[in-house]
């Protein structure tokens, strides 16, 4: 059970507990009011008896003494009821306060989880963007080869047996996109990198240089291969 589910279950339980405590508080309040009413009536009767002249009697009146003691006991009972009401109210307050603190902790945990998820998503997006930028400008030096996914135009050309050197692309081209190969066109389809560090073109379409698959080992474009052979012949 997750924290949210557990907290929701505790809230349902809290509602029932508070309902019982509030019902008991109402009962105690009614009892307290009735006890105070009866005690007030008793006190008023005693005061009325005193006014009628019984207070001037030097002989102790045991009935009045007993009456006063009963009134005092009733007043003490009212105090006990009031104390019980305060205890119940404090218990209800503590229960609500405990759940509020739990909710605060849950909100803090949720905020922390959301913050970490946002940071992870931002880091992933940055890595993807860096990877795309690296693929666009990555050189093929040191024998590294790169294969690009074919565009719709290059796929159609391959199915008809046409090479990129004699294929007329009608697709819109971004004027800011870099061009490659001896055909001086943008990157599409599978491409191979020349292993000559000084190669001016660097990347070539398979079809333009007569390749059908990635060459094994080092590979040099026609121009660099010619220069390399001429240097060996000297």
Curated annotation (Swiss-Prot):
Subcellular location: Nucleus
Effect of residue 195 to E: Does not affect binding to H3K4me2/3
Domain of life, source organism: Eukaryota
Record-listed Zn(2+) 2 binding positions: 194, 199, 221, 224
GO CC, alphabetical: nucleus
Database matches in PROSITE patterns: ZF_PHD_1, ZF_PHD_2
Keywords from the named record: Chromatin regulator, Growth regulation, Metal-binding, Nucleus, Transcription, Transcription regulation, Zinc, Zinc-finger
Site positions (Histone H3K4me3 binding): 180, 191, 195, 203
Annotated spans, Disordered: 129-166
Record's compositionally biased regions (Low complexity): 149-165
Main location group: nucleus
One MF annotation (Gene Ontology) recorded for this entry: zinc ion binding
Keyword Phosphoprotein: no
SMART domains documented for this protein: ING, PHD
GO annotation terms (biological process): chromatin organization
Function: Histone-binding component that specifically recognizes H3 tails trimethylated on 'Lys-4' (H3K4me3), which mark transcription start sites of virtually all active genes.
Annotated family: Belongs to the ING family.
Assembly, per entry: Interacts with H3K4me3 and to a lesser extent with H3K4me2.
Domain comment in the entry: The PHD-type zinc finger mediates the binding to H3K4me3.
Protein name per UniProt: PHD finger protein ING1
Organism annotation: Arabidopsis thaliana
Lineage of source species: Eukaryota, Viridiplantae, Streptophyta, Embryophyta, Tracheophyta
């Amino acid at each position: 059970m997750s924290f949210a589910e557990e907290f929701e279950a505790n809230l349902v339980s809290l509602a029932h507990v508070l309902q019982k405590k509030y019902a008991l508080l109402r009962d105690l309040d009614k009892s307290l009011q009735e006890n105070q009413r009866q005690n007030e009536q008793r006190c008023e009767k005693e005061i009325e008896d005193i006014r009628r002249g019984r207070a001037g009697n030097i002989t102790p009146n045991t009935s009045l003494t007993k009456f006063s003691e009963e009134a005092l006991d009733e007043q003490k009972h009212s105090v006990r009821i009031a104390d019980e009401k305060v205890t119940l109210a404090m218990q209800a307050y503590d229960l609500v306060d405990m759940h509020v603190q739990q909710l605060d902790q849950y909100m803090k945990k949720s905020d922390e989880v959301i913050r970490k998820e946002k940071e992870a998503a931002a880091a992933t997006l940055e890595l993807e963007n860096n990877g795309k930028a690296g693929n666009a400008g990555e050189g093929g030096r040191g024998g590294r080869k790169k294969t690009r996914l074919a565009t719709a135009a290059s796929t159609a050309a391959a199915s008809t047996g046409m090479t990129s050197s004699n294929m007329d692309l009608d697709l819109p081209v971004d004027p800011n996109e870099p061009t490659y190969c001896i055909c001086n066109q943008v990157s599409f389809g599978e491409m191979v990198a020349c292993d000559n560090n000084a190669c001016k073109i660097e990347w070539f379409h398979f079809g333009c240089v007569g390749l059908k698959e990635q060459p094994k080992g080092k590979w040099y474009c026609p121009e660099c291969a010619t220069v390399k052979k001429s240097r060996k012949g000297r």
